[in-house]
């Protein structure tokens, strides 16, 4: 993986504190929670806090039950948005992450389970839960915003720049 540079250099407003894909991956992995948003077949919004893990390919992985609204929504419409960060008082850094979700199987599922279990060692204890599924989100568009910096640093990436 080479270092991805910003999608739009004019959006990178703070050249003294450059963001690159390595720093972005570290930021994502330093957070275990995200807020995900999806849309139902009736065009109703849904959001929930989820536990996440992040692969070297910038894939976000989480587990959920097949009966949840998020799982049902993503089976109808695979587009998903997540917000990561911004949960700690005084730390105004966030990532907006838009992607496409799927439920991998076979060797891909096993690879992603290992990513998830590295972040959540208790994950294997849930593997036999009825209806448990794993969701992978591949990045389409990512924006890192650091409002702690002066001026604020905002950097955008296309998904293909990160994988």
Describe the residue ranges of each PLM region:
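Charged, gly/pro-rich active-site loop segments
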Residues: 2-16, 93-163
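Short, basic/aromatic recognition patches
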Residues: 10-34
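Alpha-helix boundary recognition
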Residues: 28-29, 75-76, 117
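Short beta-strand segments
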Residues: 31-66, 74, 80-85, 93-97
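Generic structural signal for secondary-structure transition and capping sites
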Residues: 32-33, 79, 121, 142
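Short acidic (Asp/Glu) patches
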Residues: 66-68, 78-83, 113-124
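Short, surface-exposed beta-strand-loop junctions and turns on beta-sheet-rich folds
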Residues: 68-70, 89, 150-152
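Short secondary-structure boundary segments
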Residues: 86-87, 139
């Amino acid at each position: 993986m080479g270092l991805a540079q910003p999608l739009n250099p004019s959006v990178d407003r703070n050249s003294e504190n450059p963001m690159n894909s390595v720093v972005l991956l570290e930021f994502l992995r330093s957070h275990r929670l995200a807020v995900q948003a999806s849309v139902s077949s009736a065009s109703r919004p849904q959001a929930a806090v989820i536990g996440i893990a992040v692969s070297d390919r910038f894939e976000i992985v989480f587990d959920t039950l097949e009966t949840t609204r998020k799982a049902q929504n993503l089976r109808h419409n695979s587009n998903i948005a997540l917000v990561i960060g911004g949960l700690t008082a005084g730390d105004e850094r966030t990532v907006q992450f838009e992607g496409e979700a799927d439920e991998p199987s076979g060797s891909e599922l096993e690879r992603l389970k290992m990513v998830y279990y590295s972040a959540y060692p208790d994950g294997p204890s849930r593997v036999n839960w009825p209806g448990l599924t794993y969701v992978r989100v591949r990045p389409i568009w990512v924006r890192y915003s650091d409002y702690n910096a002066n001026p604020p640093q905002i950097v955008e990436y296309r998904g293909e720049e990160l994988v």
